[in-house]
Regions:
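N-terminal lobe of the biotin/lipoate ligase/transferase fold
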Residues: 1-108
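Long, positively charged amphipathic alpha-helical accessory segments at protein N-termini or as interdomain linkers
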Residues: 1-7, 86-114, 124-170
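Short, basic and Ser/Thr-rich N-terminal targeting/leader segments
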Residues: 46-48, 118, 127
Length: 170
């Protein structure tokens, strides 16, 4: 059965558009956190290149223990399972590479001028557009970088309105 994403895309369709077979797409309509889902799958042996997407996160994670809100239809929430063969001292580069890729992708697709706010945010006009959180397995045998991109948010709470933005608002 094909997994629908926002009634327009499906996991199978995304998979077919990729130029490589390295990535395997998995989709659920709602999860507590794509990072939690990916970590659970990694612990059960998910291979390098497994991608976990959800339309809604009920308990998305941000850096420093903060929550990341992603109500239905408002964001891209995605986590990967990576099993890289790199030195521990270079693992922090994964977050930077994810951020650069997101910033470039957003700019290429939308024309929005984006930048990186070290170490894990993509910003537009000084406001956060995207956040990245990379977690490591307990034995260091896998990484789970997660990314949340604010896409269709039309407003933010008063305490976030001067700090956050979305593709829609830009």
């Amino acid at each position: 059965m094909e997994e629908e994403i926002n009634s327009h895309l499906s996991a199978d369709r995304i998979q077919s558009m990729l130029r490589t077979d390295r990535w395997t797409i998995h989709y659920r309509e709602s999860v507590d956190s794509t990072n939690n889902w990916a970590r659970q799958e990694a612990e059960e042996g998910a291979p390098d290149g497994s991608v976990y997407l959800a339309d809604t996160q009920t308990a998305g994670k941000g850096s420093r223990g903060r929550s990341w809100g992603s109500p239905e239809g408002t964001s891209i929430s995605m986590s990967l399972v990576l099993r890289p063969e790199i030195e521990m001292s270079r693992i922090s580069m994964i977050t930077l590479v994810m951020g650069l890729g997101a910033a470039d992708g957003i700019r290429d697709v939308t024309g929005i001028d984006t930048g990186i706010k070290w170490p894990n945010d993509v910003v537009c006009r000084g406001k956060k557009l995207c956040g990245i959180l990379t977690e490591m397995g307990p034995n260091g045998d896998y990484l789970v970088p997660g990314i949340g991109i604010n896409v269709n948010m039309d407003r933010f709470s008063r305490d976030l309105s001067d700090k956050a933005t979305s593709v829609f608002l830009e």
